[in-house]
Amino acid sequence: MKKQLYCGSSCVKYILEKNLIDTDNIKSDMIWISELALSLKQNGLSNLHIYCYNSKLYTEFINAKINLSFDGFKYLKELENQNIQIVEKNISINSFASEIDNCKYMILCVESSVFNNDTSMVGGHYVILNGRKGNKVKVINPIKEKYEIKTLNINFLIKACKDYGAWRIIIMEEKR
């Protein structure tokens, strides 16, 4: 029986498969965006950028003595060790639109309750953004063993991510 993939692992799997990269060895239970970025890099996608804005986790990481037994800090430290830079970057409509336009894929961390319009949901969720037309963004949403593809308004996506640190991984086109 196949292990069910967490949404972050599903995002990594989707992007690796689209780049014709084997996905047999990816972790099924990745939850930290830094963990997703490390997996993408370890599997050959090195042209990555990581952005966040107003993230409590990142602020604590850069301003305090950190406890590396906490996975959130451990993976951020590993990004540092791998020379993957995290940039604090505000998320406005224009900057977000530009990020989407200038990348092949973006993995975005959204607040589940906002993204699904369901206040009973808690925690974060990862989705893939893949291009836009005007204010409409193509969203690939990993759900269990499949991917739901839909179009959402850019303002809605900003609303869904801004209170969760606006964490995003920008995956640029790889040179072949």
Give, region by region, the residue ranges found by the protein language model:
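Short coil/turn linker and secondary-structure boundary residues
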Residues: 21, 87-91, 149-152
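Predominantly the structural core of cysteine protease catalytic domains
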Residues: 37, 41-116, 121-123
